[in-house]
Design a protein with these regions (language model features):
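Short alpha-helix of the ABC ATPase nucleotide-binding domain corresponding to the H-loop/switch region
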Residues: 323-328
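Conserved Walker B
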Residues: 10, 317-322, 349
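C-terminal lobe/lid and adjacent interdomain/linker elements of RecA-like ASCE P-loop ATPase modules
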Residues: 4, 329-414
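Pre-Walker A-like glycine/lysine-rich segment at the N-terminus of P-loop NTPase domains
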Residues: 2-69
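Conserved catalytic network of the ASCE P-loop NTPase/AAA+ motor domain
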Residues: 96-97, 108-110, 304-307, 334-338, ...
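Electropositive, glycine-dotted interaction segments
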Residues: 114-246
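Conserved ABC ATPase signature
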Residues: 49-53, 253-304, 312, 318-322
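Conserved P-loop NTP-binding catalytic core
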Residues: 35-51, 55, 64-124
């Protein structure tokens, strides 16, 4: 689970910003009432959800995009070649040519890890992994490409990873050592890689048909509840697999000519829905339900899987195409989960409610005079007491992070 993320020189982020998922020590009645929004992992109490507010073009999305870019590199950098250009943009007003940095602290099997790397658009410059097996910081490996070209000077290892120099010899400046070491079956690196690959959900995604059927059957009542919140009149939903006959051509590889056409059977998922007004009339879900209902279905598959399996979801503009009550329900699912974590951006001030979110769960992004983004928490405002109206204070500009609107519209209208 995430303890902390630090970023610098990504997109509109210039100076280092910190997203802290460790619950602050808030000794108030309201914080105690919202204790279910936190969970204990090891010796740490962590937040389940964090909301990021800010004006348009303030840089809210930059936080999500930067995390996605860095985690995506961990997933796939072992496949990069010498022509790869990394999928991010440094801060354009002074950040071009300077390194970008990413650091994450997380808990894996109750042990704290600290992983970081530094890079520019075309190569990895530094990388390091530490862990705390007995509560004390211990090096797994460090890498500094400025000390090259000799790999023995670039890398420093402890005795955690098996034959590490074999991995280093196969790690180019385009590749993260963790990615390569995992690919080469090194245990500690595999554990770290698996953490990012299995725990971090960077966006909504698809499932195979058997997983869809399983998730639907396991969560049918919750699906129907979500549909009710979305003002759907669906009252029943069933699923099954049917064998469908498909025709397939047999091709002669020698001349690419069709030799024959064969019928084959494949299992196909069939989802049937029933509506309030005519509960005996079946509807083919994929053919007859609306695009919006199908999008909601796919999204909720992801969310229910994440919540049940204690994964981590990043969402930019969580309210997009969703009713605000449904968004509130989704956030509530995470806050009621065992240890799932949700990081999301939003414009909707209806959700800015300190009766439902702790002060350390609310972050703001504000654009500085130089165009860069600053990230800070409502918890930083020590004079903001429980019981005050956070939405009203935000709209009045008390926390900045709102757009400047010139109310003199006469010239614009003319």
């Amino acid at each position: 689970m995430i303890l902390e993320i630090r970023l610098s020189n990504f997109f509109s982020i210039k100076d280092e910003v910190v997203l802290d998922m460790q619950a602050a020590s808030i000794q108030t009645k309201k914080a105690k009432e919202l204790e279910e929004n936190t969970f204990v992992c090891g010796d740490e109490r962590l937040l389940k959800t964090v909301a990021i507010y800010g004006a348009n073009a303030s840089g809210k999305s930059s936080v999500i995009k930067a995390i996605r870019a860095c985690v995506g590199m961990i997933f796939s950098s072992h496949n990069y070649n010498e022509n790869t250009i990394f999928a991010f943009t440094p801060f354009k007003f002074g950040g071009i040519g300077k390194p970008s940095t990413f650091l994450i602290r997380f808990l894996l099997e109750g042990i704290e890890y600290e992983y970081s790397f530094e890079l520019n658009k075309v190569e990895i410059l530094k990388e390091a992994l530490y862990y705390y097996p007995n509560g004390r910081r211990s090096l797994v490996f460090s890498r500094d490409e400025t000390k090259g070209p000799d790999k023995k000077n670039i890398y420093e290892f402890r005795s955690v990873i098996r034959r590490p120099m074999d991995v280093a010899a196969n790690t180019s400046k385009k590749t993260l050592f963790v990615s390569r070491a995992s690919q080469m079956d090194r245990d500690t690196a595999k554990d770290v890689f698996r953490y990012f690959n299995e725990r971090f959900i960077l966006n909504y995604f698809g499932y195979n048909s058997f997983s869809v059927e399983r998730l639907l059957n396991e969560n049918k009542e919750q699906f129907l509840n979500v549909l009710r919140i979305a003002d759907s009149d669906i009252v029943k939903i069933d699923s099954r697999h049917e064998n469908k006959v498909f025709s397939t051509a047999v091709i002669d590889p020698a001349d690419n000519q069709i030799l024959s056409v064969e019928d084959i059977q494949k299992p196909q998922l069939v989802i049937t829905t029933y509506h309030r007004n005519n509960p005996d009339v079946p509807f083919n879900f994929f053919a007859e339900e609306s695009d919006g209902t199908q999008r909601l279905f796919n999204m909720m598959l992801t969310i229910l899987d994440i919540v049940k399996n204690n994964k981590i979801l990043l969402i930019d503009e969580i309210e997009t195409q969703l009713h605000i009550k449904l968004v509130e329900y989704i956030i509530g699912l995470f806050n009621k989960s065992e240890s799932a974590q949700l990081i999301y951006t939003t414009h909707n001030t209806y959700l800015l409610n300190t009766n439902k979110l702790r002060k350390d769960q609310i972050y703001f992004v504000n654009k500085r005079d130089d165009g860069s983004s600053d990230l800070y928490s409502l918890f930083d405002y020590k004079d903001f007491r429980d019981g005050l109206d956070a939405e009203k204070a935000y709209l009045q500009g008390r926390f900045d992070a709102i757009p400047y609107i010139d109310e003199q519209t006469d010239n614009f209208i003319k």
